[in-house]
Curated annotation (Swiss-Prot):
Annotated GO biological process: negative regulation of DNA-templated transcription; response to stress
Residue stretches making up the HTH marR-type domain: 7-139
Induction section of the entry: Repressed by the HTH-type transcriptional regulator MtrR. Negatively autoregulated.
Superkingdom per UniProt: Bacteria
Protein name as it appears in the record: HTH-type transcriptional regulator FarR
Keyword DNA-binding: yes
Record comment: activity regulation: Repressor activity requires the presence of the Integration Host Factor (IHF), which binds to sequences located between FarR binding sites A and C. IHF binding to the promoter region stabilizes the binding of FarR to its binding sites A and C and as a consequence, enhances repression of the farAB operon.
Single annotated GO MF: DNA binding
Stated role: Negatively controls expression of the farAB operon by binding directly to the farAB promoter region. Binds to three sites (sites A, B and C) within the DNA sequence upstream of farA. Also represses its own expression.
Gene3D superfamilies: Winged helix-like DNA-binding domain superfamily/Winged helix DNA-binding domain
SUPFAM superfamilies attached to this UniProt entry: Winged helix' DNA-binding domain
Length: 146
């Protein structure tokens, strides 16, 4: 009889939960002809203004080589612009264009409506608890290495 780690199901559960959530959002993103990763970038830039490349990669959970290609496609679509400060050519900052902001507003409304529907099912208290627990779990590496 196979043995199973008592904690192995946490990773699987997180992946399954993400996939269940994405079934609510993929149709919205598909209609706008953007990917999940592109939406994460657009959302982060809309919520933070200008971000540097490294910060965007970290916050979006996208590896830097992959981010480069995604940003190139978003630039070609006229949604994102790269900015290089004159005092440090090694750094790259990213910002939404007005078209990118417009797309965020359009999609953001539908995304918020889906989150509201999810909250109706789970309840506000559980949604807040889930958000807090996920934020805590995201910082686990720091907690274990200190």
């Amino acid at each position: 009889m196979p043995t199973q780690s008592k904690h192995a199901s946490i990773n699987i559960g997180l992946i399954q939960a993400r996939e269940a959530l994405m079934t609510q959002f993929r149709p919205i993103l598909n209609q706008a002809n953007i990917t999940d990763q592109q939406w994460r970038i657009i959302r982060l830039l809309a919520e933070n203004g200008t971000l540097d490349f490294q910060d965007l990669a970290n916050q979006a959970c996208i590896l830097r080589p992959s981010l480069t290609g995604i940003l190139t496609r978003l630039e070609k679509a006229g949604l994102v612009v790269r900015l290089k400060p004159s005092n440090d050519q090694r750094r790259v900052y990213l910002k939404l264009t007005s078209e990118g902001e417009k797309l965020y507003e359009e999609i953001g409304e539908e995304v918020d409506e889906r989150y509201d529907a999810i909250e109706e099912v789970l309840g506000r208290e559980k949604m807040l608890l889930l958000k807090d627990l996920l934020a805590e779990l995201a910082k686990i590496e720091d907690a274990l290495n200190s």
